[in-house]
Amino acid sequence: MVHHVSVPFFFHITDDGPARILRLTSPEGTNRLTRACVLALTAALAELRDELNKQPRPLIIAGNRHFFSVGADLNEIAALTGPEAYEFSAVGQTLMNAIASYLAPVIAAIEGHCMGGGLDLALACHRRIAAPHAVFGHRGAALGLMTGWGGTQRLPRLIGKGRALDLFIAAEKISAARALEIGLVDAIASDPVAGALRQLVAASS
């Protein structure tokens, strides 16, 4: 049974009451989803999935106060060849699908910036709780990029095609209040991790 897992420069996993908390911890603080990070996350989820038959536990994914995740490393993407970019897209999709198909509830506890592939990560979770200062966006279009990690499918299903196009094509950034209004997040809490834990306790009582 995993009580504490730490992958230097990427994330650590700890137990807290009814849930496991996976906290992104990149050294620069923006929680970029590099290829190495995505692969490490996928491996960690596979290990946790193997344990679910013994002790099913929900998972809370969080970042830090200022950044949930800014998504992929743009410098890394710029250096990719065509085949490498295709493979990186497939690697990211594998992670997002592992989260979406996880056998226990997965909640994104979002503070600060949740952008690009970071938003894809949040969209793959089953629920999203945001801090009042959270900011959401998919600014790839402004950079000549489009996500390959499933966000173009999950976001329209969640908030509708028109609103999703506003976020994708206009590279619009929205507040937590607006995200709640359009259904992108399920709740706002000053401490999203604590809010997620409260929801899980209430659901199990």
Task: Identify what each model region corresponds to.
Residues M1-A62, N97:
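Conserved CoA-thioester-binding segment of acyl-CoA-metabolizing enzymes
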Residues V2-P27, I169-S205:
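Amphipathic alpha-helical segments at domain termini/boundaries
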Residues L22, I61, D73, L121-L123, ...:
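Hydrophobic/aromatic residues within transmembrane alpha-helices
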Residues A62-L95, C114, A142-G144:
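Glycine- (often His-adjacent) and acidic-residue-rich active-site loop
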Residues L95, M115-F168, A196-R198:
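CoA-thioester-processing core
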Residues L103-H113:
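A short, small-residue-rich loop immediately preceding and capping a beta-strand
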Residues V106, R128-I129, I188:
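Short, well-ordered beta-strand core segments
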